[in-house]
């Protein structure tokens, strides 16, 4: 048997199993998340990290073997390798040199998995029209698995709450709560579509109720506000699909309205209240301190001042403000100095602004960026720049060092700073390609693409981008970004494969021949 013959048979065997392979890969995700949680508990998380990288390598090898366009994979990999080389050069040229190449490489590999997985899933979708059904079924089984793991965590008394200190919110076993809550929102639209296709109304009502109740009790704002978005979108596209059974609309509408009416009893509202009380307590300390400080004109110091007012204060007053900043933004003050941090906060003395974690991380990243040279801004700075070894001294004079990580939660700013102008442009262009496929497809083939299936895929895509920007932990967390990869490949299949949509079709709109 020749090598070509053996390869041909191997490729056919692998291609025939493509649907099952995608299904198995999706089912593996919640299992890996649980294993990762327990590995962290037992301080052996490196094992699961290696397992995910091994899975990534195997998936890419599988997709490469069955692909008819291997050159695309090679070009894609070569482009990213060139970018990584340029990024490393920028890190070496940066002040202080390349501090932690290993940690930086790990962050890079986590970030680039999404586009690579997308390429692999596109290959899988192109090989079989049954893959979309496997994806829908995979999302359903994933939700079932996640719910069973949640129940098991409570049965064993090992559950983790969404908000640990307040002990509220159903989370189960999860390392990164933002990612887990995002995943739960991601899978619901296609689950509802999959069950709807079965034409079993009672099963659909039950599934919708369970999914939305789960999102309600998880307790994150992401999941809570996903309920009306998904519910209203489902109702709208059922209308588009000319569904005649009014029970679908009544049931979905009733569940959404019930969740909205019960906001005051929700975990989200409880957490907002607890946060407000906590902020009031902390603000009282600042207010008590500010009562002793007055402007040169004798007026009490407001919660926002300007540089001129600050410069006019006596040394004792400046020292009190310094102590406030050291208390609530100590690592930032140690890294950049008090005056610069005070200026970045626009001379604020409001505790809600000083202690907002996302805002702290954004300001920290911005200051690191401002200190970077042009080469670094082109290709991004390294991950270790977001880490501070914060030194403190207790009342007995004993010094301790705590590692504080300011890694950005919001994905797009993180990619901008870590990837620079070039990396960010590549990432945005990659996502924009699929968005343009949707736009061109709707303009040129509206009736064929404006369907319930396309609508649920589109809603999932919009949710993913919104959550990546405003909540984060999607694009740079492989356990969440793999779902985005699936949806991007699904979009490609709906448009470029099934309807033969091409970006250049947009120019045909202005031509006399509009046969698409």
Model-derived features: positions:
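Long extracytoplasmic/lumenal interhelical loops at the membrane interface
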Residues: 328-419
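Helix-loop-helix junctions and helix-breaking kinks within/between transmembrane helices
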Residues: 36-48, 205-243, 258-274, 287, ...
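N-terminal signal-anchor transmembrane segment
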Residues: 1-65, 86-94
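Loop-to-helix entry and N-terminal half of a specific, functionally important transmembrane alpha helix
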Residues: 22-26, 209, 410, 433-470
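Aromatic-anchored transmembrane helix interface
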Residues: 48-55, 76-89, 98-124, 137, ...
């Amino acid at each position: 048997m020749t090598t070509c013959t053996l390869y041909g048979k191997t490729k056919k065997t692998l291609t025939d199993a493509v649907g099952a392979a995608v299904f198995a890969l999706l089912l593996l995700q919640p299992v890996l998340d649980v294993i990762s949680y327990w590995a962290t508990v037992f301080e052996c998380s490196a094992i699961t990290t290696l397992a995910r990288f091994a899975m990534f390598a195997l998936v890419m090898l599988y997709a490469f073997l069955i692909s008819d366009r291997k050159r695309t994979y090679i070009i894609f990999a070569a482009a990213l390798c060139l970018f990584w080389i340029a990024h490393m050069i920028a890190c070496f040229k940066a002040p202080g040199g390349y501090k932690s190449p290993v940690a930086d490489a790990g962050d890079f590999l986590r970030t680039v998995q999404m586009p690579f997985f997308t390429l692999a899933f596109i290959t899988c979708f192109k090989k079989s029209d049954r893959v979309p059904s496997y994806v829908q079924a995979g999302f359903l089984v994933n939700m079932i698995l996640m719910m069973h793991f949640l129940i098991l965590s409570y049965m064993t008394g090992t559950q983790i709450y969404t908000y640990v200190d307040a002990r509220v919110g159903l989370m189960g076993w999860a390392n990164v709560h933002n990612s887990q809550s995002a995943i739960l929102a991601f899978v619901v639209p296609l689950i509802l579509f999959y069950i709807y296709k079965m034409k079993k109304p009672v099963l659909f009502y039950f599934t919708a109720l369970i999914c939305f109740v789960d999102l309600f009790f998880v307790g994150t704002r992401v999941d809570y506000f996903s309920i009306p978005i998904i519910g209203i979108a489902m109702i709208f596209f059922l209308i588009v699909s000319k569904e005649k059974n009014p029970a679908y609309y009544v049931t979905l509408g009733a569940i959404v309205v019930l969740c909205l009416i019960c906001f005051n009893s929700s975990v989200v509202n409880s957490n907002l209240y607890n946060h407000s009380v906590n902020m009031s307590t902390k603000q009282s300390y600042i207010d008590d301190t500010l009562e002793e400080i007055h402007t040169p004109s004798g007026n009490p110091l407001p919660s926002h001042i300007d540089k001129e007012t600050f410069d006019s204060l006596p040394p004792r007053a400046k020292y009190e403000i310094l102590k406030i900043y050291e208390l609530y933004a100590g690592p930032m003050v140690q890294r950049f100095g008090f005056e610069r941090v005070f200026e970045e906060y626009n001379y604020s003395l409001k505790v809600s602004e000083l202690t907002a974690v996302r805002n702290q991380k954004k300001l920290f990243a911005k200051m690191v960026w401002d200190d970077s040279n042009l080469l670094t801004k082109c290709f991004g700075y390294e991950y270790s720049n977001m880490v501070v070894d914060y030194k403190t001294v207790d009342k007995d004079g004993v010094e301790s060092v705590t590692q504080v990580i300011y890694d950005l939660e919001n994905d797009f700013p993180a990619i901008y700073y870590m990837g620079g102008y070039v990396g960010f442009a590549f990432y945005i262009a990659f996502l924009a390609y699929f968005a343009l496929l949707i736009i061109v497809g709707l303009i040129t083939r509206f009736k064929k693409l404006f369907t319930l299936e396309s609508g649920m895929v589109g809603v999932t895509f919009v949710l993913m981008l919104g959550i990546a920007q405003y909540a984060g932990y999607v694009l740079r967390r492989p356990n969440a970004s793999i779902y985005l990869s699936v949806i991007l490949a699904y979009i490609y299949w709906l448009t470029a494969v099934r309807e033969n949509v091409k970006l250049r079709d947009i120019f045909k709109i202005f031509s006399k021949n509009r046969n698409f």
